[in-house]
UniProtKB/Swiss-Prot annotation:
It holds the Pfam family Cyanate_lyase. Keywords: Lyase. PANTHER family: CYANATE HYDRATASE. Its EC number is 4.2.1.104. This is Cyanate hydratase. NCBIfam families: cynS (TIGR00673), PRK02866.1 (NF002773). It catalyses: cyanate + hydrogencarbonate + 3 H(+) = NH4(+) + 2 CO2. Signal peptide: none annotated. One of its GO terms (molecular function) is DNA binding. It comes from the Bacteria. The active site is at 88, 91, 114. One of its GO terms (biological process) is cyanate metabolic process. It comes from Prochlorococcus marinus (strain NATL1A). The keyword NAD does not apply.
Length: 147
């Protein structure tokens, strides 16, 4: 998978500064997953957020526009992912997507979970049998309307 030049530049600067997405999130007052989505061109920063980020990473203001312009979301390659970690999420949806859809619709009715009015958090859960990854998604329910 190839990434835009802006993504590569941001990731390189982050690595050179020895920062994590969590470190940058604290600086900006935003969640680490949202910050990562900004790096990958899937979110839009405010002018203030872009200025803080660019200053922290030691990058010039010529990169501000790419951070503050609304992106084409979901614009990653439309093929089945090959990265093992990302593929697991694809696999999870293949196995549990329809069951999740049915359970959500039993509880809420006919509609969807928003990915706009939405948060996602990633946590580490220590376990003697092997640490666990806990992914929590919280999206507003949007019922389909009748007309």
């Amino acid at each position: 998978m190839s990434f835009p030049e802006s993504t590569q530049l941001l990731l390189k600067a982050k690595k050179e500064k020895g920062l994590t997405f969590a470190d940058i999130g604290i600086l900006l007052g935003l969640d680490e997953v949202w910050v990562a989505s900004l790096f990958y061109g899937q979110s839009t920063a405010s002018d203030e957020e872009a200025d803080k980020l660019l200053t922290t990473l030691g990058l010039g203001t010529e990169h501000k526009e790419i951070l503050t312009t609304p992106p084409v979301k979901g614009s990653l390659d439309p093929v089945i992912p090959t990265d093992p970690l990302i593929y697991r999420f694809y696999e999870i949806m293949q196995v549990y997507g329809m069951p999740m859809k049915d359970v959500i619709q039993e509880k809420f009715g006919d509609g969807i979970m928003s990915a706009i009015d939405f948060t996602i958090n990633v946590d580490k859960v220590e376990d003697p049998k092997g640490d666990r990854v806990k992914v929590s998604m919280c999206g507003k329910f949007l019922p389909y309307k009748k007309w």
